[in-house]
C-alpha cells in the first residue's frame, strides 16, 4: 500500500528541534509532518506563489539557510533574487480511484480488491489523510483509496513518482550567491516578516506582500519555483479569519469562524496537494490567505480566545471537515449532493433556524421542486432564517438574474437552446443535475458548481428558472430566481452572524451547522 499519511504525534509541549530542519528537507516538505512552535502551536506550510522562473524577497537581517535551522547560514543584503537553474519537472502518474474505505473497513476493502481480481484487473491502494494523536485522543482522517488500472469514470488520484529537481540560486543586492539542491530557506530578522514581491492577487494584478515566519523556495512540479510560507497557526488564522468573515461581525460569529478555519487547516492535511512540496495553498481551493498586514484586532482576539479548539466527531472518527459558505439561503445542503462521495454525518443540510422557525415552516424541512418557489419567495426578515436577519442578508439571501443566452449557448455548445430542466436537486433545493436541449443535441450537466458555471456563474444552485420561447421553440429569455451564495454545506457565514446577533454563543453556532460533533481544546 502506498502511504501518503504520516502519524503526527501532537502535544502541547515544546518541540526540542525544528522538524522542518531535519536531514532530509525534501522528504519533510512533501510529507504531512508538522513542526511546532516553542509555545506549542502547529506550523502550517502554505504555497503563496508557484510556476515562477525567479522571485524576489526582502527583509532586514534576513538569513539564508540551505539546510534549515541548525545548519550553515548566510547573512547578506536586504534583498535577494532567487532563480532555478536546470529545473526539471516532477513526474506524476494519475490513477483512477474506484472505491474509498475507512482504515477500519478491512472486510469491505478486501471484498473490493477480490472483486477486481476476479475481473483480472490490477489494483493499487493509497492511503490519504493523516493520523493525529493529541493529548491521548487519536484523530483519524485517513481513507484507503482503491485504484483500478484501465478503468474510467472514477476520481483521479495523482501520484508523484519522481520529484522535480534543480539548483535553487539566490543572489543578494551585494552580489553574494548561495546555491543549494532543490530548496533554500529564508528566515526573517527582528521584524519577523519577509517581503515577497510580485505576488498575484485575487484581481489578477501583482502586489508586494509580507509574511510571518519562514519562507522556503523550492522547485515545483513544473520545474520552476514555488514559494512556501511556513507559518504558525495563530498567525495564519489571524490573516485568514478577517479574509473569510468581516471583522466587524459579532465576536461570537468570529470565534465560530476561527474554529471552523482551524478545523479546515488541519482536516485537509494529507488530502490536498499530494504531489506538491506544501500542504495547503493560499486560494479558495484551500483557504484564502494574503499574508501579514491583513489582521484585525477583533478577528485576532477570536483566534486567541479559541486557541487549540477543534471540532471532533462524536463517533471518534477524527476532525470534522468544517467547510463553510457565504450564505446558505436559509437551508443547508448535504455534502454528497455538492461534491459526491460518502455522506458525512457532520455535514447534513437543514433549515437555518431554531425550533420555533422549524415549527412555523414545517414543509421546508426538506425543499423539493414543489416547495422551492414558495421558499424563494421568503424575504429577509428579523424573524426568518438566521441568514435572513442581519443587514448582510440583503445581498445574497434572495437574488434574481437574467441569463446572457448567447454566452450560455457558447459554453454549452449544443446550438440554439430549446430547454433547460433541473432533473435532480439536493435537500436544500440546489440543482445537482441539469438537462440541456439545443438544436445540436442535448447533454446533462452534473454537480452544483458545474451547473452554476454553465449558466453564467450563478451565486448558488438554489434557483428556479422561468423560460420564454419564440414560435420555433427556441429560448428567448431565461429568468433566474435564486437564494444564497456558495455551496451551502457546513456553516453559513451570514447565518452565524445572525445567530450571534440574536445572542447565541459560538458553541451554539457550531452546533447548528456541524451535527454529531463537539468542541475539544487539543493544544
PLM regions: where:
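Repetitive helical segments and hydrophobic/amphipathic motifs
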Residues: 11-12
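Conserved, single-site charged/polar hotspot
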Residues: 6, 15-523
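Positively charged n-region of N-terminal signal peptides that target proteins for export
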Residues: 1-4
